[in-house]
Regions:
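Residue-level structural signal for beta-strand termini and adjacent loop
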Residues: 135, 148, 181, 227, ...
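Acidic/polar residues in short coil/turn loops that connect beta-strands
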Residues: 116-117, 126, 139, 162, ...
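Short, surface-exposed secondary-structure junctions/capping segments
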Residues: 368, 387-396
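Conserved anchor residues at repeat-unit boundaries in beta-strand-based tandem repeats, strongest
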Residues: 99-103, 119-130, 142-153, 165-176, ...
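Intrinsically disordered, low-complexity PEST-like regions enriched in Ser/Thr and acidic residues
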Residues: 92-118
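Serine/threonine-rich, low-complexity intrinsically disordered segments
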Residues: 4-5, 9, 23, 42, ...
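Long, low-complexity or tandemly repetitive, helically biased scaffold regions used
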Residues: 4-95
Length: 405
């Protein structure tokens, strides 16, 4: 049945019920005590005024007024002590007719209706989509589900013309509540929505095997979450506006692990990096790299404490060797470079310049017994003639090839 046919049928039924009410008003007026006739006549006049124009787009608004007229009339009649049985009977029939009119007005009709951007087929009440229906858009999109007050509301399935599919809850025309969104490329989101955006708790499964499970806000990862990569690596921690930010833990597939601060999707701030081989770094991070002050502990017991740049010892730092040796000084790109002091476990020490991890250029070598010699060094070894200062005060020029370091 078409929309027009449904409308005509409904209007015919409305007219019949309105006629019933009018007839009962007239009969009630004839058979009521004289003191009620004026009241009944006044109510009938108001009733007729309201119902003279009962076009479909206006009639639903008149129902409330008609209900008010009937209820007021009924209350005033019932308060009259001289009311007779016939008056009661006709008033009861008027109220029943009004009940039928209300029921008819709220009863959904099945319609087929065209809109500016598509066609609707389904339940229709008071000139609005209400109940279950199907809407096929001119663009090729399709919605099948529940409507309320002319908007998608309740459970529904929306098929997009690009192949995406949403299946879940709606509120006031938008994704709201729990739903599943299947993307044409294979990605799937299952979780909570708010005003068309992922919001709340949800799981996003990527076609490449990655998966995120956690909190969302305004369509982006936000709050606590777990991201599992297809290679087995895993991040557990905080997100902000779609990126890792705050405290987090990253466990790499090869056994490495990071625990610490994140900013803008990168390791940044304070943190600890554990290597699978037993090495460990504690300190500052920037853009995923060791940068700033930190401590690197090797699995063999060696320890470096100092400044880092781009994952390397760079700046001022101290290196403690497991055998008791120690270096304090400048570093560049992971090697001793600049001024420094190297302490040997024997009690001797070297003070001077370093390059490429070795003493280079001017330097002084101090012996445990108080002697020292000054001169040039190359690749950590004395070269040329050195001046040797003895602990007893003697000074002499000595060929450096005779020195043992």
């Amino acid at each position: 049945m078409t929309t027009e046919e449904n409308t005509i049928l409904k209007e015919d039924q409305q007219k019949l019920i309105l006629q019933e009410i009018e007839n009962n008003f007239k009969e009630m007026s004839k058979n009521s005590p004289s003191e009620l006739k004026e009241l009944i006549k006044d109510s009938l006049d108001k009733f007729n005024t309201i119902t003279q124009d009962s076009e479909k787009e206006q009639f639903s608004d008149k129902i409330g007024v008609l209900n008010t007229i009937i209820n007021i009339t009924s209350d005033r009649i019932n308060k009259n002590r001289n009311i007779n049985e016939k008056t009661k009977k006709y008033m009861s029939e008027i109220k029943y007719s009004m009940y039928k009119l209300n029921t008819l007005e709220n009863k959904p009709s099945f319609v087929k209706k065209s809109y500016h951007n598509g066609k609707y087929e389904g339940d229709y009440i008071n000139g609005k989509r209400e109940g279950k229906g199907i809407y096929i858009y001119d663009s090729g999109d399709k919605y099948e589900g529940e409507y309320k007050n002319d908007l998608k509301d309740g459970y529904g399935i929306y098929e997009f013309n690009n192949g995406d599919i949403y299946e879940g809850n709606y509120k006031e025309g938008l994704f709201n509540g729990k739903g599943i969104y299947k993307y044409f490329d294979g990605d799937i989101y299952e979780g909570e929505y708010k005003n068309d955006l992922r919001d709340g708790q949800g799981t996003y499964m990527y076609i490449n095997g990655n998966k995120y499970e956690g909190q969302w806000k305004e369509g982006k990862k936000h709050g606590k979450g777990t991201y599992i990569y297809d290679d087995g690596s895993k991040y557990i921690g905080q997100y902000k506006r779609g990126k890792k930010e705050g405290k987090g833990e990253f466990i790499c597939f090869d056994g490495d692990k990071y625990v610490g601060d994140y900013k803008n999707d990168h390791r940044e701030g304070k943190g600890v990096f554990y290597y699978a081989d037993g090495d460990k770094y504690e300190g500052d991070f920037k853009n995923d790299n060791f940068e700033g002050k930190g401590k690197y502990t090797y699995s063999n017991g060696n320890v470096y404490e100092g400044e880092f740049l781009n994952d390397k010892f760079h700046g001022k730092g101290t290196f403690y060797y497991v055998d008791g040796d120690k270096y304090i000084g400048d570093w560049k790109n992971d090697v001793k470079d600049g001024k420094g002091i190297y302490y040997y476990n024997s009690g001797n020490r070297y003070e001077g310049h370093f390059k490429d991890d070795h003493g280079e250029g001017k330097g002084v070598f101090y012996y445990k017994n108080g002697d020292r010699h000054e001169g040039n060094f190359h690749e950590g070894k004395p070269v040329g003639v050195h001046t040797k200062y003895y602990s007893d005060g003697r000074v002499e020029k000595v060929d450096s090839s005779t020195f043992k370091i």
